[in-house]
Each structure stands twice: as C-alpha cells, then as structure tokens.
From Swiss-Prot:
This is Adenosylhomocysteinase. It catalyses: S-adenosyl-L-homocysteine + H2O = L-homocysteine + adenosine. GO terms for cellular component: cytosol. The keyword GTP-binding does not apply. It comes from Methylococcus capsulatus (strain ATCC 33009 / NCIMB 11132 / Bath). Disulfide bonds: none annotated. CDD domains: SAHH (cd00401). NAD(+) binds at residues 199-201, 233, 262-267, 285, 320, 341-343, 386. The keyword Secreted does not apply. Its EC number is 3.13.2.1. Its main location: cytoplasm. HAMAP family: AdoHcyase. PANTHER family: ADENOSYLHOMOCYSTEINASE (PTHR23420:SF0).
C-alpha cells in the first residue's frame, strides 16, 4: 500500500512532509525489533482490546520510538491524537508515517511556540465536539493546558503576568480559546479519567498540583517506575547525550573538561558517557547525598562559579531554573559548548543572552558572540540536546519506558474508579514484568528460586522480589 496515497483524503494532521512516510515506516519496522516489551504487550492484550473506547491525547516527543508506542495503543483499541512535547524533538519521517496511516498527529521539527500550543490544543479536539478521556503526557504541558485553562475560566488574572516568552504564547492561546469557546477547558477537564506522566519535570508538576488540591483526575507517575528512571534516564542519556553533542559540533570529547550540572539518574548517565570518551568530568550538586555519590565515583564536585571559566563543555541535568546564568556564560572560554538535557529550556538563561549577536551555524547550533570577542556554542537553544541535535534515546531503552506507559494507560482507563485524584506509581510486580519482557532480547537468563530459598527470604517464587522502598 502507498502510505501517502492512503492519506490523501485524510487531513486531520500537520506534518512537515507526508512523502517521508515510506522512510519513516522502514525505520519503525527496525525499531519494533528493538522494542520487545511493546511488541509483547501487543501480543498479550490485542484480543482483549483493553483500550477500546479510550481517546488518548498524547503529548510526547514524536520520534520513531514513539510511533511504535502510538501503534501499540491503537492495536489495543485506543483512538489517539498526538503532538510533540518539544519544538525541536520531532522526527519528521516518523510523524509522516503516523499521519499516513490515518492517525491524527500535529508535529514538525522546529515548530514555533504559537504552533506548539496550537497543536497541543488540537490533540484535545475530537470529532463530534468531544474531548479525550485520557492524557499521555511528557513534561506535563497537555495537563497544564487543560487545568490552567479551566482555572482561568474562573480567574482570568492567572494569565495576567507571564514570566517568559513561552508563558506569553501559552497565555495568549488560552485567552483566545476562552473568548471563542467559553467553558471549553472545564468540559475537557471533566471528561478526563486520568493522566500518565513520562518525565521528572512533569511528575514534579503533578505532585505540586496534588499538594495544592488542584489535581482534577488521577495520575500515574511513570517516571518513577524503576524500569523507567533507572534505564531511560540513566542508560538512555548515557548514549544519547554524546550523540547529540558530536552530531552538533564534531568536537573531540577526550581531553576536555566537562561539567554536568546535577547528579541524579540523568546526570549519572551523562557523566559516565563523557568520562567514557576521555573527558575529565566535574559535577555540580545541591544535594549532599548525590554530591557524595559523585565524589565516591571519582568525579570532582565543584560549583559553577568555580567551573564556568575553566571547562569546555557544560551539560545541565537538574530540572531546575537558571542553573547556568548570564554571568556564568560571559566568563566562559572561547568555543565552550553549552547544552541542556533536562525537559525544559529554563535551566540555561538563554533569554539573557539575546542581547548579544547570534550566528546560526546550522539547525540547533548557534554561536553567541560575547562583548569580549569570545564565542560560546549553544545547542538546541537550551532545549533537549539529545532530541534537538540527534534522535534521542535508543529504541531498546525506550521500550522499557513505553511499556510502562501502556500498562499505566490500561490501568487508569480500565480501573480508574478505584483511584482518587492523587499521583500513583505502578506496582512492583508490573515493574518486574517490564524488566522480564526485555531480558531475552539481550541474552539474559534469570536464576529461579527454590521453594526453600523463597521461604528463607520471605518472597514469592514469582516475585515481587524487593519491597517498594528498595533503592536499586
């Protein structure tokens, strides 16, 4: 079948180029061979169709791996509308392949902020003037749009004082929708059974909403499943960070001083990859436990004030705001590389650098010319470097994350009534199931407990093997 011809009468999408669909389909087929968890879930649940009746609004990087997730959700009965959760992260051939198969997708690499929020609205608009009943989120923007819009219907002052360019665009988009369709956000919010959240930043938003009594539906924190955070965040970043830096700059990493800001799971993976390629790695941390971990691994733990004029490569991985400041950047060495692997672009004070001359080298690579004549290299305008300058994490590790997402969607859609408006994590037995589904692919074989051994340590032979408080 000609995928592009198949999509000729289907216009509920916005992608860069539908003619890329064939290329995308070939890469999706390869990715499926590296995503055993998702393929096993398709096989296990296809007949039961547990997501039949689900209308899932998806806001997650529109990559080849995400295409496999989308098609898994559809195979289990769901209707899906999709947008990317980052303006630079879309792989256009992946989006084209999904659109060519008649699935509404709104994403292209290099979106404007206006388009970004327009597309996030589009995933909430379903034929027949109905909305989604599930959200699958990465970073929390789809959830934010629905909940902030509903609150602004009652208190317009919430949109009065944007603190950055992104908020200016978001608030304007909400005001426009409020004028055109009064009460629309509240109707959408009322129809949502639950949300599953992919990443650290989005989970932080959910817990904030819960603490303030503003979470209007149940949420599952996928990020803190062990098979997500200890694999995607650690091993995924260990491979995709240096892929992004090298594709963008062709720089030799060996011999350089690299600073990783933040030593959580993401920072740990970044530090390992940079050290593995021969860099001297320094760490900045606010948490004494993480700082001690870094020091015990042989990294030098410093402050940015100490490091800013000495290092060659800077990577933010904190999930915080303003960790690399204007004052840090103006002190940096000539040709210092600055990038971010946290979800949002707020970790680096990019806006403060707009006062200087910018020279675009190629897409997502800019020279910022400082008054002293030195130039620093900013990657992906401070957004996710591994997706802006490369293609993100490998398929295998994303299979772990997306298998969790699929199981979480099934759980909330099928059993949502038993959940309060709180944030939950998937139970340990499902975490272990996700891991088990991936062992055969990499040639790993489990040892089985004897009855005597299981009784001795007090666990079932089939698991779970660890208590919920166990730290892997």
């Amino acid at each position: 079948m000609n995928a592009v011809a198949n999509a000729a009468s289907f216009d509920d999408h916005k992608v860069a180029d539908l003619s890329l669909a064939g290329w995308g389909r070939k890469e999706i087929a390869i990715a499926e061979t590296e995503m055993p968890g998702l393929m096993a879930i398709r096989e296990e649940y296809r007949a039961a169709q547990p997501l039949k009746g689900a209308r899932i609004a998806g806001s997650l990087h529109m990559t080849i791996q995400t295409a496999v997730l989308i098609e898994t959700l559809v195979a289990l009965g769901a209707e899906v509308r999709w947008a990317s959760c980052n303006i630079f992260s879309t792989q256009d051939h992946a989006a084209a392949a999904i659109a060519a198969d008649g699935i509404p997708v709104f994403a292209y690499k290099g979106e404007s902020l206006d388009d970004y929020w327009e597309y996030t609205h589009r995933i909430l608009e379903w034929p027949g003037d109905v909305g989604p009943n599930m959200i699958l989120d990465d970073g929390g923007d789809a959830t934010l749009l629905v909940t902030l819009g509903a609150r602004a219907e009652k208190d317009a002052s919430l949109l009065a004082n944007p603190t950055c360019e992104e908020e200016e665009v978001l608030f304007a988009a909400i005001r426009k929708r409020l004028a055109a369709k009064p009460g629309w956000y509240s109707r959408i919010q009322a129809g949502i059974k639950g949300v599953t959240e992919e990443t650290t930043t989005g989970v932080h938003r959910l817990y904030e909403m819960q603490a303030k009594g503003r979470l209007p539906f149940p949420a599952i924190n996928v990020n803190d499943s062990v098979t997500k955070s200890k694999f995607d965040n650690l091993y995924g970043c260990r491979e995709s960070l240096v892929d992004g830096i090298k594709r963008a700059t062709d720089v030799m990493i060996a011999g350089k001083i690299a600073v990783v800001l933040g030593y959580g799971d993401v920072g740990k993976g970044c530090a390992q990859s940079l050290r593995g390629l021969g860099a001297t790695v320094w760490i900045t941390e606010i948490d004494p436990i993480c700082a001690l971990q870094a020091a015990m691994e042989g990294y030098r733990v410093v402050t940015m004030d100490e490091a800013c004029d000495k290092a060659d490569i800077f990577v933010t991985a904190t999930g915080n705001v303003g960790v690399i400041t204007h004052d840090h950047m103006v002190k940096m060495k000539d040709q210092a590389i600055v990038c971010n692997i946290g979800h949002f672009d707020s970790e680096i004070e990019v806006a403060a650098m707009r006062q200087y001359t910018w020279e675009n080298i190629k897409p997502q690579v800019d020279h910022i010319v400082l008054p002293n004549g030195r130039r620093i290299i900013l990657l992906a305008e401070g957004r996710l470097v591994n997706l802006g300058c490369a293609t993100g994490h490998p398929s295998f590790v994303m299979s772990n994350s997306f298998t969790n997402q699929t199981l979480a969607q099934i759980e909330l859609f099928c059993h949502g009534a038993k959940y309060e408006n709180k944030v939950y994590v998937l139970p340990k037995h499902l975490d272990e199931k996700v891991a088990r589904l991936h062992l055969k692919k990499i040639g790993a074989r489990l040892t089985e407990l004897s009855d005597e051994q299981a009784a001795y340590i007090g666990v079932p032979k089939e698991g779970p093997y660890k208590p919920d408080h166990y730290r892997y």
